[in-house]
């Protein structure tokens, strides 16, 4: 090498260095080939790869689910990522920020935007009958945005495609802003509902179905279905205290009636509604009523219930000629007062000797496990109305048969009042109306056919179903427990006995209550038919203290008579 350099002319330095670099490169290449090092040394020089191949290599390890079988980017994956980003932006927005923050979306990065323009749309394998097509992502996305809405944050309702804030009880200090009035004329379509429901959204085209995300799915023109789990406390609406009133029933002529006394009471004057609709039937049910009552959880409405089930049950309930059926049945024009005894199952009745006094009333109301045999001297024998929920009826027959309650009260003149507290009540009532076995999983272990619980002369004209409006009115105005402001608000409802007593106060002129909780209840067993003393346990699903206070006040204001022991 030195010899060659010395023989070169001095003015050829450029040529000399080029020769040195060439020889040096040749030597390095030769040694690399011998030891297999050419890949690592020249790997950085491979820069002429296609954009599609780079996306495949760079991304496939991180998001393999976003790719189709042939290695090209799947439109489904891109749309899922965008929906996921938009959803997380909405969820992470602090509640104190304005509505503009809730509408914020994330724009995809430039590399994804470039790739989306030339993607091949490949549907999921389970989507049958859809041919693979190549389409512009931008146009598909635009069509999709018109048909889809992002899943809202809990506490946010969807109405006509616009997001509105659902009021929660904790926001009462700003009541005007905290309540929402929906449009009842709007048909309801339930998101992610697999049940056979009434209103169905228009079927989207196959291309839209194919690209709909699986996990972070947007709903196609569907109003968000209200769920109790989305509310930390009982939701409040600006129509929460509005009810259907009845103007067709006769007016009481009794000057000492509950209505007359309530009108003179400073406490009840603005609370008591003497003409509220008590019972529901097919004439009270339509799409508008479904939309309204779907905002309230059972027994106060239809939240989370299936429209088809509710509609089938309601359509089979015969119309009630009169809501005030006792006043309508009064045959005399002479001013008389209708007296009613409402018999609870409290231990205070044990050895009370109230049986004869109870039977002296015009009508006697009994509830759930109304054991009579062996306790006639304490609770009487007469029954005019029997109130229950599906569960309280079947469980009482199951658990109290050995104590004498082997069948529900039956007779020619007995009427039944059903308080529909949950979906199982609608399933049970449907089976009763159709005279069929109840569906498996809905109280069927207590007996398959509900009609077997009634006598052979049973007709639906003897069967009354409490209107959800009426039950919500009782809860809102008389038994609004503080438990409704707690996370377990959905568990609370007034006791079945409380619902029956308040129903009697809206049907009768004079009411006497027996076997209800009073001061000093600790001295008595839970039930009058208990063979051994059992303490009354206060569970969160009922508010016995509140009921005790209400009964005491009604008694003190001479609205009703409450049986108490000194």
Curated annotation (Swiss-Prot):
Tissues expressed in: Heart, kidney, testes, brain, liver and lung.
MF annotations from Gene Ontology: alpha-N-acetylgalactosaminide alpha-2,6-sialyltransferase activity
Residue intervals on the Cytoplasmic side: 1-16
Gene Ontology biological process terms in this record: host-mediated regulation of intestinal microbiota composition; oligosaccharide biosynthetic process; protein glycosylation
Similarity comment: family membership: Belongs to the glycosyltransferase 29 family.
PANTHER family registered for this protein in UniProt: ALPHA-N-ACETYLGALACTOSAMINIDE ALPHA-2,6-SIALYLTRANSFERASE 1, ALPHA-N-ACETYLGALACTOSAMINIDE ALPHA-2,6-SIALYLTRANSFERASE 2-LIKE-RELATED
Protein name as it appears in the record: Alpha-N-acetylgalactosaminide alpha-2,6-sialyltransferase 1
Gene behind this protein: ST6GALNAC1
């Amino acid at each position: 090498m030195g010899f060659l350099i010395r023989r070169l002319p001095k003015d050829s330095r450029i040529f000399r260095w080029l020769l040195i670099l060439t020889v040096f490169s040749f030597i390095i290449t030769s040694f690399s080939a011998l030891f297999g090092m050419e890949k690592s040394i020249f790997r950085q020089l491979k820069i002429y790869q296609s954009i599609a191949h780079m996306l495949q290599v760079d991304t496939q390890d991180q998001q393999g689910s976003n790719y189709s079988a042939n290695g090209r980017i799947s439109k489904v994956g891109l749309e899922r990522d965008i929906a996921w980003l938009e959803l997380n932006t909405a969820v992470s927005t602090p509640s104190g920020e304005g509505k503009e923050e809730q509408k914020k979306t994330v724009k995809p990065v430039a590399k994804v935007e470039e790739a989306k323009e030339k993607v091949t749309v490949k549907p999921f394998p389970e989507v049958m009958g859809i041919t693979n097509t190549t389409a512009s992502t931008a146009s598909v996305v635009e069509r999709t945005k018109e048909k889809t809405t992002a899943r809202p944050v809990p506490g946010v309702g969807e109405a006509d495609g616009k997001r509105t804030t659902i009021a929660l009880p904790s926001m009462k200090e700003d009541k005007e802003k905290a309540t929402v009035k929906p449009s009842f004329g709007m048909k309801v379509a339930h998101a992610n509902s697999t049940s056979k429901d009434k209103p169905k959204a228009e079927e989207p085209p196959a291309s839209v179905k194919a690209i709909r995300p699986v996990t972070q799915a947007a709903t196609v023109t569907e109003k968000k279905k209200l769920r109790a789990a989305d509310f930390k406390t009982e939701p409040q609406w600006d129509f929460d205290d509005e009810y259907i009133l009845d103007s067709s029933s006769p007016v009481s002529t009794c000057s000492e009636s509950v209505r007359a006394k309530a009108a003179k009471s400073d406490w009840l004057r603005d609370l008591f509604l003497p003409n509220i609709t008590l019972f529901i039937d097919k004439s009270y049910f339509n799409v508008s009523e479904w939309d309204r009552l779907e905002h309230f959880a059972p027994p106060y409405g239809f939240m989370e219930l299936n429209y088809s089930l509710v509609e089938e049950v309601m359509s089979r309930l015969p119309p009630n000629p009169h809501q005030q059926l006792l006043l309508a049945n009064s045959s005399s024009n002479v001013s008389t007062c209708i007296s009613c005894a409402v018999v609870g199952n409290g231990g205070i009745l044990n050895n009370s000797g109230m049986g004869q006094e109870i039977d002296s009333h015009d009508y006697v109301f009994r509830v759930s496990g109304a054991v009579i045999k062996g306790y006639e001297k304490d609770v009487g024998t007469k029954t005019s109305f029997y109130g229950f929920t599906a569960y309280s009826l079947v469980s009482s027959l199951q658990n109290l048969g050995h104590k004498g309650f082997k069948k529900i009260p039956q007779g020619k003149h007995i009427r039944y009042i059903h308080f529909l507290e949950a979906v199982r009540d609608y399933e049970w009532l449907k089976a009763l109306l159709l005279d069929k076995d109840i569906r498996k999983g809905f109280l069927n272990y207590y007996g398959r056919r509900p009609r077997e619980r009634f006598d052979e002369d049973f007709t639906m004209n003897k069967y009354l179903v409490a209107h959800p409006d009426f039950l919500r009115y009782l809860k809102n105005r008389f038994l609004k427990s503080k438990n409704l402001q707690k996370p377990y608000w959905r568990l609370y409802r007034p006791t079945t006995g409380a619902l029956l007593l308040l129903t009697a106060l809206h049907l009768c002129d004079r009411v006497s209550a027996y076997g209800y909780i009073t001061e000093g209840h600790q001295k008595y067993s839970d039930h009058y038919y208990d063979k051994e003393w059992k303490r009354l346990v206060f569970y969160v699903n009922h508010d016995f203290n509140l009921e005790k206070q209400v009964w005491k006040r009604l008694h003190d204001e001479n609205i009703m008579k409450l049986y108490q022991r000194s």
